[in-house]
């Protein structure tokens, strides 16, 4: 049951990822960053878990993916600035998020498409899990990170294709 309520537990969990993202830029030390990635991962899991049990809201449907993408973007950007990842690795890690943002804008501008159709789908969830795994790898086992980048690229291509097909079907139906 979707509601227009703003202060739901899932929304608060999603919102909590925004200050976690900001903190990622300022905390020093690997341990503190591991805690931040862990908290972001847990809040993402639990807000989704609660939403699947009926605690959904219109705001949450928008807020959750924005919070996810913001946390990953800020964290991987911090690693880029610090020289821990290359520019190409950075863009591969955020490629699905860039494509989703562009798709959202296109869906908003074109008749027959509804940007609210951008709901969480399995391919996108796989990308998010791999992105969070990549952040953990950069902090705990940096040598593993390069092996995750091609997996993120493949999963991102899958997610982008899935969203593109979904939008195409939506446009054909309208």
What spans do the regions from the language model cover?
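Proline-centered helix-kink/hinge sites
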Residues: 10, 19-22, 65
């Amino acid at each position: 049951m979707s509601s227009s309520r703003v202060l739901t537990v899932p929304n608060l969990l999603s919102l909590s990822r925004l200050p976690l993202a900001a903190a990622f830029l300022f905390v020093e030390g690997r341990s503190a960053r591991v805690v931040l990635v862990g908290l972001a991962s847990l809040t993402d899991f639990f807000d989704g878990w609660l939403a699947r049990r009926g605690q959904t809201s219109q705001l949450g449907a928008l807020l959750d993916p924005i919070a996810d993408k913001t946390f990953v973007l800020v964290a991987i950007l911090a690693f880029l600035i610090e020289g821990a990842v290359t520019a190409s690795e950075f863009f591969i890690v955020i490629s699905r998020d860039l494509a989703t943002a562009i798709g959202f804008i296109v869906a908003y501008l074109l008749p027959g498409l509804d940007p609210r159709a951008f709901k969480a789908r399995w391919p996108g969830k796989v990308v998010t899990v791999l992105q969070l795994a990549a952040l953990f790898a950069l902090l705990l086992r940096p040598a593993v990170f390069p092996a995750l980048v091609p997996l993120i690229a493949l999963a991102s291509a899958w997610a982008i294709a899935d969203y593109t097909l979904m939008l195409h079907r939506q446009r054909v139906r309208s």
